[in-house]
């Protein structure tokens, strides 16, 4: 029995050992604040922690931390040296920095002059992998008070001895510097080779030149590297990268646009660079290089078009690094990761269209990816370097890929000891957080933790919750801490660990629950010690706890033997039952790893995992296309075809060339076996003439350097189902060059969007029927309208849409469904229809200030509403106007005005009822900063116009006296960009014979004058009126020449005005046509033979205009030369071009063509608008020469030709009918981006030596350059510089106002109620009106108290002229009986306190002053009797006044001055009396030559001495006095001195010389009559002799 108990005692410890789980050793350290950074030294137990600017060290894997006694200064950051595992750097904000070379045990200082001013960036250290003692340290130094910008200087310092001596400044002002040996595998240059880019800036901050240099002696000497076609004056080098053994130079194509496309130039030797064929719109800041190999470069291109859902494209290159292939699109958030240690293995999250992407609450994933907005996320894996992707297989019978179920991972990385996120340094063991299903779940709490043991090909569930994790001992120890996300705010109370590669897990309690911030172990993942860092669950403080977890004693520390290991072969897909591993780079990879259930550890601390490589048999996949070849887009197999772009360069000066079509991928390790190289590669001989563009016209002509290389033009074709219904460019930002988003709606209610200028389109995944879309005034704003009460709102140019529910369906009674706020994207007004049970419907307005999340009813029975306060320069910014039913009470059926349209005003944030402004209106229009309201006067039954500039006070907009506008007459507000409102009033409404008067207002929009009569309009109210963009005051209009006929066919003629409608002329026709044949216009007047253009009313797309705002002075139009405009289909119709603002024209093509401008006019494109075609014509030299380009393999019917509204892009879209199905459309995107080899050089500091020249518009009459009173100079690309593009060059900064000119007739237009007489170019009163009528009209207005006596002219608001001829003389006069109001208005009425201040205050001051002077200066000094002693000679007088202080001195001087003044006046009077009165009268007659009843003139005498004595030197001011001459007016006529008047004056002066012998140079006539004289103007009398 005793023996049994002995056995029992012996078994108890054994049983307990079986039932009690292993617990690792745990220690914890508490801190008052969380660590900013925590990193391990490589192959060490030492780690550094930065907390509150204190650097701490742990020498025992985080069990305890201690201060570093050698460091006395605050530390802003620290960095481990990747080239030396024992070295680290700690940086301060002083000149003293710290370095350790023994893994943190001891630190020393070094000094560097890097903080001599404001620090704009944290210093960055550049390392050298070949010589670790070669280092560079740099930061940006900015001018005081400025943030990081181009004015900041990047300063580099270098050391050759690892900072043992003080670093020296690199003697170059570099933008970026890199060591050639910046990677372990780099074969470029020497250990001391440095590459630097240097930007030369001008005084405007523009980059003038950008250079790339290298140096082998730290820039004591330097060598410039020339990269063709990258010229130093073209583009901007923005970065230099060393990736593996590739060197990449990244340049911005447009150095003036930070969002410009970029190019990458690749080299393997650092000397010879070739441009990579990244045929994508890469923008700086969104290109990221991923872990690459010697055989390929990998990178992602992030697309930031969507603010809610950011995606990236994944690219891989061939072994040359030059030819890239898109491997994956729509990578969600750029989340793609290379699996460590396994070549060719990648995991990525991909955004896919969701069946219901807009429903559901926002979650953590939504914040990270934007999941609720547009996309669902699925995870995929590739094991052949991205060539093929597959869903991730889960070893779960309830989730099979064939059932649309797979694993989707939110995260599959750990934080390594260096602070980087990696999949883990394990032999194929991975952990990830995600869920099974069709896509990644939005709710974080639904996710679980999964494990893979085959490199990510298949997975198993590990934990029922999401966790952060880390690997130890090559994956044999896994530590995981639960992480519940932001929604479920709960701290982790436990951690879990697995000792069998994730098969089973044990739970361990944490002494202090934490929110985990980091879990890490040694960099190589071989240690069994971990650190868990996190903050506690206290809401009041952020205490940090750092746990040290040690698994060293697990399995009693046993080290594995050979039997405990297995061979793991990577990249086994098991697809189709095939268990063979996939070969990548010509080899298989094997690993020796511990068996899953082995009870031991590898226990090889700080020893990296070893990969066993096994070569494969060579196949087609081990070869790539050779130089001059590219992969075929048509063939699915690995077929290489000649590449025209590459051959253009390779064929220089050659007639034929022989090249291998394929080459073995560099770094590939495949084994030929029984194969030969010829089995995979063939030599091909190519004729260069088949691939090199001769640049001619297609008929064998010699190359024209002005036409570029058409091989650089790219065409992208897209097919759409349904006919074209609507399209529009949407700008992404305020940058004019950023409007790359194109939205297309088809007739079948589908929507397509492109964010690359039309290169590719994506269908918007919305199942609702889309009626249309509206683009708002704010960049990126677009709203989709559906047939239901659902709308979709986007503020990122259509990259993503938010689903919103509106109160009602859109109202068919309102001509638009939505009214946008011009400044706030969150605000808009919705117009919906609400119907009652009896079928009666009303149109209501609803307002939102949260982008449609909520709505409030604004007003019922509306016609339209607008945010007018947002566009007016003054007034209430919350003001809203609505036009609607006069009575707001639907039940008030007795109101006779109920059906009339009224104008109401409301406030956005006010709950007050709408305020009625006008009872009876036709409508209102917003133009510029004016609001014009058309009201009906019920008394006179006439149409009146009211104008406001502040939304509160309305002024009458008075039409000319002879124009009465009936209520039924249409008027159209056309423009207000020139500080005046242009309006067209229809005067003839006969169908198909409509025309009217073009009126122009004064600067405040109150008085309108007739500027052009019989202006053509069409049936729907559009007018042939075009304001020319970019040129002040240039207008083109068509008039009906046979207006009196009133029936039949209109005879249209085209007129142009260069002074904002004041004067009009016909277009001067070209002398010859495009074929060199003369036009029969010689000897004919412009009335009989001129150029006429088809105008606004005949355009299929009203957005197509003659001009471009960016191509200053360029105009293109379709028309003919003759007496009248002929129909479009007339044989005489042709296309014409002007490059000088419409002064001269040339015919460029016979027939009707569509046109577009590109790159601010350096690219002109024409395409046939009538006939089916497969070609377009383009010009790169301002229309001097044209080249044909075939864009399609078949002829198509073209609907439209388009580009960005600013005409600054180099991409054009042709919308055409699909020839395969006439019900569908095609787009051809023609990309000229690469047709220019360089960007034009702009240097405003030295404009004579760049690619631009100044151009000034010239007035066609007189030929001078004074337009609107000033001479302007605009920058344009210089003639002959046709090899460069403009891009975003700020040409406006080079605009010059050369001078202000003297005023001439061209600076004036006719005043209110005056009209220009085309016969003598004078302004006359309108028919039936006199000056008295004008006074009566103006004074009859309500509250009027003044009127103006007009000369008949008023200065054009745009004119800035000075001096010269003054035609306007506005003289305000009081209306009868309104003198008191008039005087009060002008401050002339003196009464009350004003009278007291003007009279009594000065009188009191004067009397007080006199009394004071008398008392101190006269009475005290003896009174007036002593004043007689004061003589003019101060030395002889006997007056010695009392002067006790400075006041006495001043007073006595005043007394003396007064005495002297009185004495001089008395002496002067006495002298004049002595002059003979007869002589004085004679002198007066000679001077004034008076003649009774005649005008009075001043004759300048010949005696210069007398002249100077009487008048001074008159010659200096002669021109000014002549310009001051004024003129009179008749009741109906105002004459002005034009050129013919000057001739008459010269003739009269000749007559004067015959009658009198006088010096003509000294004799001048000055008319000094006032304006009331009614004698005939400019009457000149010969002076009479006295």
From Swiss-Prot:
Keywords noted in UniProt: Glycoprotein, Golgi apparatus, Membrane, Protein transport, Receptor, Repeat, Signal, Transmembrane, Transmembrane helix, Transport
Residues of the signal peptide: 1-21
Any one Pfam family match given in the protein's UniProt record, by short name: Sortilin_C
Residue spans, topological domain Lumenal: 22-1394
SUPFAM superfamilies on file: Oligoxyloglucan reducing end-specific cellobiohydrolase
Glycosylation sites noted in the Swiss-Prot or TrEMBL record: 1004, 1300
Location of this chain's protein in the cell: Golgi apparatus, trans-Golgi network membrane; Prevacuolar compartment membrane
BNR repeats by residue range: 450-460, 496-507, 792-801, 846-856, 1136-1146, 1177-1187
Location of the region described as Disordered in the Swiss-Prot/TrEMBL record: 692-711, 1527-1586
GO cellular component terms given for this protein: cytosol; Golgi apparatus; membrane
Transmembrane parts of this sequence: 1395-1415
Residue ranges that the UniProt entry lists as topological domain Cytoplasmic: 1416-1586
Residue stretches of biased makeup (Acidic residues): 1540-1555, 1568-1577
BP GO annotations: Golgi to endosome transport; Golgi to vacuole transport; protein targeting to vacuole
Principal place of residence: Golgi
Membrane topology: Single-pass type I membrane protein
Function: Functions as a sorting receptor in the Golgi compartment required for the intracellular sorting and delivery of soluble vacuolar proteins, like carboxypeptidase Y (CPY) and proteinase A. Executes multiple rounds of sorting by cycling between the late Golgi and a prevacuolar endosome-like compartment.
Recorded family membership: Belongs to the VPS10-related sortilin family.
UniProt name for this protein: Vacuolar protein sorting/targeting protein 10
Organism the protein comes from: Candida albicans (strain WO-1) (Yeast)
């Amino acid at each position: 029995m005793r023996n049994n108990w002995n056995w029992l005692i012996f078994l108890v410890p054994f049983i307990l050992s079986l039932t009690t789980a292993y617990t690792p050793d745990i220690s914890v350290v508490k801190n008052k604040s969380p660590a900013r950074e925590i990193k391990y030294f490589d192959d060490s137990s030492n780690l550094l922690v930065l907390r509150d600017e204190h650097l701490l060290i742990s020498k025992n894997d985080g069990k305890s931390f201690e201060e570093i006694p050698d460091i006395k200064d605050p530390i802003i950051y620290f960095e481990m040296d990747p080239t030396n595992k024992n070295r680290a750097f700690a940086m301060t904000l002083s000149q003293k920095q710290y370095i350790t070379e023994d893994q943190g045990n001891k630190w020393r200082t070094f000094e560097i002059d890097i903080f001599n001013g404001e620090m704009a960036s944290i210093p960055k250290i550049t390392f050298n992998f070949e010589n670790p003692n070669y280092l560079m340290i740099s930061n940006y130094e900015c001018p005081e008070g400025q943030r990081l910008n181009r004015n900041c200087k990047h300063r580099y310092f270098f050391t050759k001895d690892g900072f043992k001596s003080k670093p020296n400044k690199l003697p170059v002002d570099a933008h970026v510097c890199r060591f050639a040996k910046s990677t372990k595998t780099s074969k470029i240059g020497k250990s001391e080779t440095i590459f630097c880019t240097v930007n030369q800036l001008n005084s405007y901050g523009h980059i003038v030149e950008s250079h790339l240099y290298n140096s082998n002696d730290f820039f004591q000497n330097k060598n410039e590297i020339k990269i063709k076609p990258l010229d130093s004056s073209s583009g901007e080098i923005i970065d230099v990268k060393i990736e593996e053994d590739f060197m990449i130079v990244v340049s911005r194509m447009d150095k003036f646009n930070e969002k410009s496309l970029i190019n990458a130039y690749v080299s393997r030797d650092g000397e010879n660079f070739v441009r990579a064929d990244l045929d994508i719109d890469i923008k700086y800041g969104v290109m990221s290089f991923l872990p690459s190999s010697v055989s390929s470069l990998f990178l992602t291109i992030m697309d930031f078009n969507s603010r809610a859902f950011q995606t990236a494209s994944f690219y891989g290159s061939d072994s040359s690094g030059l030819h890239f292939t898109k491997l994956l699109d729509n990578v969600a958030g750029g989340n793609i990761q290379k699996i460590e240690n396994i070549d060719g293995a990648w995991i990525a999250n991909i955004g896919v269209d969701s069946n219901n992407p807009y429903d559901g609450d926002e979650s953590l994933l939504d914040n990270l990816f934007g999941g609720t907005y547009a996309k669902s996320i699925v995870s995929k894996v590739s094991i052949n370097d991205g060539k093929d992707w597959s869903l991730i297989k889960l070893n779960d019978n309830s989730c099979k890929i064939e059932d649309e179920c797979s694993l989707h991972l939110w995260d599959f990385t750990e934080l390594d000891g260096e602070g980087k996120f990696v999949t883990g340094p394990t032999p194929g063991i991975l952990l990830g957080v995600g869920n099974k299903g069709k896509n990644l779940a939005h709710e974080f709490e639904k996710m679980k933790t999964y494990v893979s043991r085959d490199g990510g090909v298949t997975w198993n569930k590990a934990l029922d919750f999401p966790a952060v994790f880390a690997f130890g001992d090559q994956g044999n120890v896994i530590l995981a801490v639960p992480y519940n996300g932001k929604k479920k705010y709960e701290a982790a109370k436990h951690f879990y660990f697995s000792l069998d590669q994730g098969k089973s897990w044990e739970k361990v309690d944490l002494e202090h629950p934490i929110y985990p911030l980091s879990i890490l172990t040694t960099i190589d993942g071989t240690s069994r010690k971990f650190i868990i860092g996190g903050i506690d669950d206290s809401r009041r403080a952020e205490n940090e706890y750092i746990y040290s977890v040690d698994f060293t004693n697990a399995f009693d520390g046993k080290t594995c033997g050979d039997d405990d290991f297995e061979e793991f072969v990577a990249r086994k897909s098991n697809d189709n039952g095939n268990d063979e591993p996939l070969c990548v780079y010509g080899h298989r990879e094997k690993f020796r790893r511990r068996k899953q259930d082995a009870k031991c550890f590898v226990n090889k601390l700080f020893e990296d995992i070893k990969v066993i490589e096994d070569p494969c048999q060579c196949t087609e996949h081990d070869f790539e296309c050779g130089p001059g070849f590219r992969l075929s887009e048509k063939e699915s197999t690995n077929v290489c075809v000649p590449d025209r772009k590459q051959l253009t360069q390779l064929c220089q000066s050659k007639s034929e060339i022989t090249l291998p079509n394929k080459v073995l991928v560099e770094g590939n390790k495949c084994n030929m076996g029984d194969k030969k190289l010829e089995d995979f590669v063939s030599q091909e001989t190519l004729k260069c003439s088949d691939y090199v563009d001769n640049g001619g016209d297609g008929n064998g002509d010699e190359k024209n350097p002005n036409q570029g290389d058409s091989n650089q033009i790219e065409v992208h074709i897209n097919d759409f189902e349904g006919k074209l219904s609507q399209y529009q460019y949407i700008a992404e930002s305020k940058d004019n060059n950023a409007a790359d988003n194109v939205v297309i709606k088809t007739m079948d209610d589908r929507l397509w969007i492109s964010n690359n200028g039309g290169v590719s389109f994506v269908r918007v995944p919305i199942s609702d029927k889309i009626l249309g879309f509206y683009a708002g005034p704010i960049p990126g704003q677009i709203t989709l309208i559906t047939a239901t009460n659902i709308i979709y709102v986007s503020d990122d140019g259509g990259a993503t849409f938010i689903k919103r529910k509106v109160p009602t369906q859109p109202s068919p009674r309102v001509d638009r469904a939505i009214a946008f706020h011009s400044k706030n994207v969150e605000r808009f007004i919705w117009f919906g229809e609400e119907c009652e049970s009896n079928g009666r419907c009303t149109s209501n307005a609803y307002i939102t200030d949260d982008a449609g999340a909520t709505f409030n009813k604004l007003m019922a029975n509306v016609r339209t509403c607008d945010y007018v306060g947002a566009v007016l320069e003054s007034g209430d910014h919350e003001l809203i106007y609505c036009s609607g039913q006069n009575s707001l009470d639907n039940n008030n059926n007795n109101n006779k005005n109920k059906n009339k349209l009224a104008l109401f005003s409301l406030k956005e944030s006010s709950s007050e009822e709408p305020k009625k402004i006008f009872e009876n209106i036709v409508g209102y229009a917003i133009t510029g900063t004016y609001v014009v309201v058309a009201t009906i006067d019920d008394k006179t039954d006439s149409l009146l116009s009211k104008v406001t500039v502040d939304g509160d006070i309305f002024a009458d907009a008075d039409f000319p006296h002879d124009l009465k506008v009936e209520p039924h007459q249409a008027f159209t507000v056309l423009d207000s960009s020139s500080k005046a409102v242009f309006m067209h009033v229809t005067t003839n409404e006969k169908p198909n014979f409509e025309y009217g008067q073009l009126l122009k207002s004064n600067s405040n929009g109150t008085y309108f004058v007739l500027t052009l009569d019989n202006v053509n309009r069409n049936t729907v109210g559009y007018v042939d009126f075009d304001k020319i963009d970019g040129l002040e005051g240039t207008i083109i209009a068509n008039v009906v020449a046979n207006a009196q006929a009133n029936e039949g066919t209109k005879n249209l003629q085209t007129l142009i005005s260069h002074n904002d409608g004041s004067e009009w002329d016909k277009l001067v026709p070209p002398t010859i046509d495009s074929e060199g044949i003369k036009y029969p216009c010689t000897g004919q007047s412009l009335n009989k033979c001129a150029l006429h253009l088809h105008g606004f009313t005949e355009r299929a797309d009203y957005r197509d205009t003659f001009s471009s705002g960016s191509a200053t002075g360029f105009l293109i139009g379709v028309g003919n030369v003759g007496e009248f405009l002929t129909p479009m289909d007339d044989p005489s119709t042709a296309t014409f071009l002007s490059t000088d603002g419409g002064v001269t024209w040339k015919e460029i093509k016979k027939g009707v063509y569509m046109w577009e401008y590109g790159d601010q006019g350096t690219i002109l494109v024409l395409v046939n608008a009538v006939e089916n075609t497969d070609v377009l014509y383009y010009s790169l030299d301002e229309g001097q020469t044209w080249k044909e380009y075939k864009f399609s393999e078949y002829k198509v019917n073209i609907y439209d030709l388009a580009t960005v509204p600013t005409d600054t892009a180099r991409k054009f879209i042709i919308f055409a009918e699909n020839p395969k199905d006439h019900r569908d459309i095609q787009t051809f995107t023609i990309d000229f981006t690469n047709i220019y080899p360089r960007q034009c050089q702009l240097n405003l500091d030295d404009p004579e030596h760049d690619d631009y020249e100044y151009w000034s518009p010239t007035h066609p009459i007189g030929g001078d350059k004074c337009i609107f009173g000033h001479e302007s100079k605009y920058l344009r690309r210089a003639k002959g510089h046709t090899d460069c593009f403009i891009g975003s060059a700020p040409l406006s900064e080079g605009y010059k106002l050369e001078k202000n000119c003297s005023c001439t007739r061209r600076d004036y237009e006719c005043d209110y109620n005056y009209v220009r007489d085309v016969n003598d170019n004078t302004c006359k009163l309108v028919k039936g009106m006199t000056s008295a009528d004008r006074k009566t009209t103006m004074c009859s207005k309500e509250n009027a108290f003044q009127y103006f006596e007009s000369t008949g002219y008023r200065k054009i608001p745009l004119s800035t002229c000075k001096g010269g001829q003054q035609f306007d003389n506005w003289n305000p006069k009081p209306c009868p009986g309104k003198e008191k109001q008039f005087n009060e208005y002008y401050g002339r009425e003196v009464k009350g306190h004003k009278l007291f201040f003007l009279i009594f205050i000065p009188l009191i001051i004067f009397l007080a002053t006199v009394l004071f002077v008398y008392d101190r200066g006269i009475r005290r000094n003896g009174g007036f009797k002593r004043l007689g002693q004061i003589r003019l000679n101060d030395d002889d007088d006997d007056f010695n006044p009392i002067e006790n202080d400075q006041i006495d001195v001043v007073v006595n001087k005043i007394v003396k001055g007064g005495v002297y003044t009185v004495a001089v006046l008395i002496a002067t009077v006495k002298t004049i009396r002595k002059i003979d009165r007869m002589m004085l009268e004679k002198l007066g007659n000679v001077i004034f030559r008076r003649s009774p009843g005649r005008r009075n003139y001043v004759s300048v005498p010949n005696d210069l001495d007398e002249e100077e004595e009487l008048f001074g030197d008159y010659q200096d001011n002669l021109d000014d006095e002549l310009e001051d001459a004024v003129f009179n007016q008749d009741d109906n006529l105002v004459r002005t001195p034009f050129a013919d008047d000057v001739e008459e004056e010269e003739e009269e002066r000749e007559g004067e010389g015959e009658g009198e012998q006088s010096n003509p140079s000294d004799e001048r006539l000055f008319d000094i009559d006032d304006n009331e004289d009614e004698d005939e103007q400019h009457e000149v009398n010969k002076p009479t002799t006295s």
